[in-house]
Amino acid sequence: PAKYTTLYALYAEELWHDFPDEAQEALEAARKSLDYDLGKGEVSMDNMQWRAWASLILYRISGRDQDLALATESVNRMLDMQVTEYVGGQETTRGFWRSAAGATEYHHKHIGEAYPIWVLAEFVETLPEHADNQRWKDAIALWVDEYALVFADRNPFGLLPYAFYQT
């Protein structure tokens, strides 16, 4: 899965300057993992968040146009799964994610609920001049304002989703 591609890419990026041989091995592992992931063709929300992040890291390392193209394609496919309309007859919350494009199920994680937000924040920071940068910022704001804060306000303890504290 793309999660492993992300991990290998993060290792490569972290090791790049101080341990170039190990970084190169991690980079090769990330590329092999990415090839495997793309071959499987999985396009779920879970997979898209990891593929987008992995491809962005690979772009930061390599500067390759094809890495950037895959990163932006993946993050924008991820955004297509964000619920931007109110559903179920309510007008209180939105900004969360579907499990896949066109799915009725929600993307839910007990730990890692905010991973899509982390990914979007990486894109905003890495590509400040990109044409989609404002779209990424708007998706973050929608999740924060109309999902995370709504549920924190309704919780008697003022609790936020787990990963919100990590951002």
Region annotations inferred by a language model:
Residues 1-167:
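Glycan-recognition and catalytic cores of secretory/periplasmic carbohydrate-active enzymes
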